[in-house]
């Protein structure tokens, strides 16, 4: 499943389809944008499958639930994936979150949650003013503090692993994100010793394997 059409999320699609005949699942707006970017016509209609927010889709033994997100894309979504009573949630590229977001992430066992930037690094950095405003807007990305606050609201007895994801290369770094989120957990919930594994997803490597 594809969350939205920005290049850092779809640049490998053509290769996956060409080499492995991979089906592509995304919302209608995202599929339209993908087709427009497919200049070589590699992706045929037979590879494209439309999904809709809040409507579950079965992919083999996995039930996939798309949920709408606030981001500057055509029709962006996050996903939850449920199989054998266990739930994994992917919530990145969120300009903001609300009760709707929290409701979709509740009772998750594994959570990939955006911790995109440190606000001070972003504001002092080299990005153009317009791009900074976009990132900080409700259609941009969650800061480290936002990520920690959202995590506080979705912690549950089932949660075993939380991965901080989609870190900016220019406006964040792993240890800063990790410490900022832990600080938020302490300030909002008084949590010092965590009952779940908190780690940072690496940019250029697969995340560690987890078994539920």
Please give the residue ranges for each predicted region:
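Cap/insert and terminal regions of metallo-dependent hydrolase folds
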Residues: 99-200
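Metal-dependent catalytic neighborhoods of phosphoester/phosphodiester hydrolases
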Residues: 11-20, 35-38, 172-179
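Active-site metal-binding motif and surrounding structural segment of the metallo-beta-lactamase
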Residues: 1-29
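Short active-site oxyanion
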Residues: 19-24, 87-88, 196-197
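Short, basic/aromatic-enriched C-terminal tail that caps enzymatic domains
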Residues: 196-212
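Short acidic-hydrophobic, aromatic-tinged amphipathic segments that line or gate anion-handling sites
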Residues: 48-52, 200-201
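Core dinuclear metal-dependent hydrolase active-site scaffold
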Residues: 11, 50-110, 209-212
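Active-site metal-binding loops of divalent metal-dependent hydrolases
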Residues: 5, 29, 69-72, 92-94, ...
């Amino acid at each position: 499943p594809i969350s939205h059409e920005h290049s850092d999320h779809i640049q490998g699609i053509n290769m996956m389809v060409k080499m492995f005949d991979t089906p592509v699942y995304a919302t209608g707006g995202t599929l339209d944008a993908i087709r427009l970017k497919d200049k070589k016509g590699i992706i045929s209609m037979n590879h494209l499958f439309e999904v809709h927010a809040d409507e579950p889709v079965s992919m083999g033994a996995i039930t996939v639930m798309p949920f709408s997100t606030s981001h500057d894309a055509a029709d962006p979504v996050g996903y939850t994936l449920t199989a054998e009573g266990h739930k994994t949630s992917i919530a990145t590229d969120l300009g903001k979150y609300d009760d709707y977001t929290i409701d979709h992430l509740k009772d998750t066992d594994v959570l990939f949650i955006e911790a995109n930037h440190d606000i001070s690094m972003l504001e002092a950095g080299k990005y153009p003013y317009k791009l900074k405003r976009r990132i900080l807007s409700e259609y941009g990305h969650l800061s480290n503090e936002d990520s920690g606050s959202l995590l506080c609201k979705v912690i549950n007895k089932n949660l075993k692993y939380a991965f901080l994801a989609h870190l900016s290369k220019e406006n964040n770094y792993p240890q800063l994100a990790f410490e900022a989120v832990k600080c938020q957990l302490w300030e909002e919930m008084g949590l010092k010793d965590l009952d779940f594994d908190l780690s940072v997803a690496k940019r250029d490597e697969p995340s560690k394997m987890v078994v539920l």
